[in-house]
Amino acid sequence: MMHSRRFRLLRSLCCCALLAGPGLASDAAAAPAPVSSGSAPAKPVYAEWFTDEAMRVDLFHAGSGSAEDYSLDEVVWEPLWPGTRVHLIDPFGFGTWRFRVVDAASSREIFRQGYATLFDEWQGTAEAQAGVSRSMSESVRFPWPRKPVVVHLDKRQRDGSFRPAFSLGVDPSSHQISRARPFASFRTVELNPGPPPDKALDVLIVPEGYAREDEAKLQRDLRRFARVFLEYEPWKSQQAHIRFRGVESFSLESGVSEPRKGLHRDTILGSSFNTFDSERYLTVVHTKRLRQIASLAPYDALFVMVNSGRYGGGGVYNQWSVFVSDNEYDDYVMLHEFGHHIAGLADEYYDSAISNDEDLMYPPGVEP
């Protein structure tokens, strides 16, 4: 990820659009006290606290419409941290959640990033409000710490403040940290020339719903969408600093699940239309496999390219974005969902509600 360049790109985007609204130990806060945003501390120096590698914490986010909790799946080693080495403390403060990495010995905060979750949206649905419990997988990634750390997850409250929800102690020398490399046989494809990962906005496309017999189409689609993306501002004028890669991820079946039509496909990521029974909402609910495949290449931003001609997609801030490959509006959908993913931008239109109670997402007196 580019250092100050990505900062300027995001600042430009967000000023002109509405914002949406042994070694391991964990603790879910039972009755937490609010966490103040506070003033920005002195910037931590990357080389003092982190190596060139990355740490991924895979989590389960579970609950109902009125309660939720996080639990640990596993901590995973990744070979390269491609992200910022300058803005280690998130300067924007966007998202319904944030995670903070704190040095265990000194309690100094050395990394912070905001994010949103699909689970937050589900909590407002009729299903969740009726008391049904569900779980979804999520991950947070950060540079590999040189010393033991504590990872804190804080949830934004209706008034904009944060409240602690979960904490996890991690010793980077622990033998419990997974170093397995699933899907290592999948090939990474370079889609455009660009600078090295620490000086680029690294964008990764993971194909979904492409069977082995679709390989030629997969290759064409990867290159077409990388090219289309760079034809639009603000990315066009910054394309020398943006690097696209793809992963040749194949599914057992072509296409994507469409439950309302009775179509259920066996695909590598298990993506599906009709998320939360919304007609066009296309998402990946369980993202563990997506993260495993994505770890094969450097990435700051993550696309899922779905082999379908039906209109639809989805995007979650600092998580992922999903678009379709063969619709007349596919280029628009790609760019639209990227705005959700990289900058937390809201929809530029509104024609249907996912949440059963819009006040849950946009509290009166707080938003707008």
Regions found by a protein language model. Give the residues of each.
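Short pre-active-site segment immediately N-terminal to the catalytic Zn-binding motif
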Residues: 314-335
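Fold-level signature of zinc-dependent metallopeptidase catalytic domains
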Residues: 176-236, 246-256
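Bacterial N-terminal signal peptides that target proteins for export
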Residues: 2-14
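Active-site recognition of the HExxH zinc-binding catalytic motif
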Residues: 332-348
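Beta-strand-enriched, solvent-exposed domains that form extended recognition/catalytic surfaces
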Residues: 50-175
